[in-house]
Amino acid sequence: MRYIYDMCHGYIPYNDTETLFLDNHWVKRLKRIKQLGLLEHVFPSASHSRFEHSLGVSYIAEDYVDVLLRNSGEPDYYKSEYKFCVKMAGLFHDLGHGPFSHVFDNVVIKDDSNCHEIRSRRIVEEIFKEVGTSKELSSAYVIDYIKEMIEPVSNAYTNNPFFDIVNNSKNSIDVDKFDYLQRDPRHIGLDCSFDPARIINKSFLEGSEIIYSKSVSNNIVNMFQTRYRFHKEIYNHKTVKLIELMLGDALLSADNYFNFKEVSKTIEFEKLDDSIYSQILNSDNKELSVSKNILMRIENRDLYKQLWIGKFSEDGEIKDYIADTYKDIREDDIKYIKMKHNHCNGIESPLKNVKFKTNESHNELYDINTTYEENMVMIYNISNTT
């Protein structure tokens, strides 16, 4: 048994079988990918890795299985069948992230069939080939369970609540959020009132779903509000988005040299991590000169000029606004970023798909009295000339 100390959860135990996976090079690669990408350019202490986050998710996932079974009086055999798979799904769920995480997917790859969740599924198969199968792992369902818990691609397990613990596509209440909504603010230096313990301990299994006590409706809303606030004010901070735009331009310019799209589909993907930034920055290769110049601008804080931030509805509306307002700037020098800030359920209440215990009548459900989604646009001049 190995114990790893985590700043959020204390000592996390891994048995001998789990340690084989924990020590795999694909998992260790997560140490070379920052959890919050370029956020450290604005919040310097936000430099933690996806490895730390994945440890936390695996811990909460295992604990959640125990609590659900205890609260619901389910037989112990469920524990051995699902506990390992859920814990490993938590550990593996971010394996497919590329350099600087979402920038790599959203700007460079732009292919839903090769997104980080799908890459995580492929990497899980590679890891099991390398680690091999012991008696404990010999069942055919293990690999399939873990992959579907990370990112479901079939309807085979839609009615199995254990597949909603790591990635909950039904109502977005999952252990991925439970960890990063605690971990990220600690590293950024923000106070955060969100604690998932009450939600976890007031969760139950009912048929094919995880349901919750009505007494935690305010805690659930707090989770969605905290996520909304972090996305709007921190993760999508105007300077962070600007630097992400510049990094995206640098990576796209370097794509012919690194061939990101093809490499991301092969085992060579293991070599792609955040070190790509320093590789380009320190390179004398002429093929990377444009990319290097963009990164030098980031380093020297010679950033693209922000022209406008506001709400939008349609692309055509944005383009018309740009054409009418910035006639003195070359069309090729103007770029814009669109963002949606919501509570995980589009324009509707995040509680719409959350099921509560029906035999509780003494608690009123707490909801958000606000607009659930906001569409924003940021417009930039990449040449910094007017």
Residue ranges and their predicted role:
Residues 1-87, 95-386:
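Histidine-centered, transition-metal-coordinating active-site segments
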Residues 92:
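Aromatic-lined, polymer-binding surfaces characteristic
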